[in-house]
Amino acid sequence: PVIDNALAAGNPIPDELADRAALRQQAATEYAKPLPDDLRALFPDEFTHTDTMGWIPKGWGIRALDQVADYMNGLACQKYPVQDGEHGLPVIKIRELRSGISEQTDRATASVPKKYLVEDGDILFSWSGSLLVRPWTEGPGVLNQHLFKVTSDAFPKWFIYLWTDHHLQDFIQIAADKATTMGHIKRDHLTAAKVVVPSGDVLGAADRQLGPAMEKAISVLLQAQALTKLRDALLPKLLTGEVTVIGHPLRTDAQTCRRRQP
């Protein structure tokens, strides 16, 4: 939209953005529908050059990644064992972030400081070993060390998630370059990673679209988890005939599987 506005206003396009501007002009004449006027009006019609991010829309800002979000490291959960008579909560480590809760998952007491408790929809980022960032959808748990819970009081969840994900490949390369036993990043790498922050009006308009979209994506992941658990619970019972299908036990003998002869 900024390129479109600049072209419409006759403002200069930076050389670095010339190819993109040409594509926008071609798209506008061939098939693309322009944004509604009220949305286009939210965007500037000029660019300004910055040392850290190159050309950005005029009036927008640049901040460090750890200025737009709080990256809270987890606990050494072995110091918080399950208490007598308590079922406890799963300990969320890198393995759980990557593969989910399993029988091998450790457990810790639920009586940890509230900020270390994880709920569905929280954004988790493993900063050591296998670097991953994703919304958590495996139910309540306790955040282990080597994982960040990513939150923000000032910016939407989708904004901090997408910008963390945007820098993920750079973080992975940093961790790989300095790996000894287990590669990792440090907090100063979060400070070095920069974020382009749009105007409040643009951010608000984007949030009205992307906020519900992200919540829908998380909801779909939760539904997939529920269906997976249902499948895992029912399949063994179906195979043994303990559960019937349309009122009949599922047959698994050789006669059932034998092809009919013509």
Predicted region positions:
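Extended, domain-scale alpha-helical bundle/helix-rich regions
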Residues: 1-31
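Proline-centric
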Residues: 55-56, 147-157, 173, 188-216
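Short, glycine-/Ser/Thr-/acidic-enriched flexible segments
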Residues: 70-73, 96-99, 130-132, 155, ...
